[in-house]
Amino acid sequence: MLDYAALAAFAAVLRTGSFDAAAQILGVTQSAVSQRVKALEERLGCNLVQRTRPARPTEAGQRMLRHIDDATLMEAQLIKDLGLLAPNISAHFRIAAPSEAINGLLLKALGRAQMQNFEIVQRNSDDVLDLLQRGEVNAGITSRPLSISGVASYSLPPMEIVACASPAMVRNYPEAAILKAPRLVTAPKSSLPDIWAKAHFGNKHDAFGPARIMPSLGDCVIGAQSGLGWVAAPNDMLKGPLETGSLVQIGSGRARAEKAFYWHLQQRLEEAFTPLITALNAEPA
């Protein structure tokens, strides 16, 4: 059996990025944290932490951290099932998802499920698949169904995609010509503009104008409000700007544009994630 205090010290160092910050969280001295981590490394016979700023895990350390996260989640669920009083168990989990799924689905679901101590990793769907296969995240959202051993998959309600632009841009570009205007995206091959364009103009829609790359989907929305281009984004993200009039919907009343998403998580953690699965309205795929 591994020492719980040493495991807690090791995890705290990587969560906070330093031995000093870990000591403050744990309420012990920095020397005590260092000794516990060193003892754990000696017990296992390998280095777990790169002594950099911030501190980073070695390959073995990354695997150990995943083990700690999984074990903590299952321990918390066991104590809940047994109806016992938990001694302040703090389960930490990682979820990977594309930016549109984070903004359009995940954040609200996390709030409804009252999940705590989570980390969201923003990646495209293909990268989410890789992270799931390597076990570097506990769960993930992709835009296509997957079949991975040991991973449970669920289909999510389709997400409505809406296109908007500033009032000035809408005046300058008739609806039929909007595709020629600059579009704001997080990556050159972002699928959201194409999904929206196909729903509104058909599969053989005109070629897009220039793409302006932004750091996040939220920045795309802000950029659209500033007149930098038009944006296709989850409907929920655009409700506020549409209500204030800083953005105008393009092609309202036409066919609904939707994007499908799928929720995947490690099967052994399904019970621990039940509140989030419910909040996402997920159905077994």
Predicted regions and their residues:
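Short helix-boundary/capping micro-motifs
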Residues: 11-27
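Hydrophobic hinge/microswitch elements
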Residues: 205-250, 254-257
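Secondary-structure junction motif
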Residues: 180-204
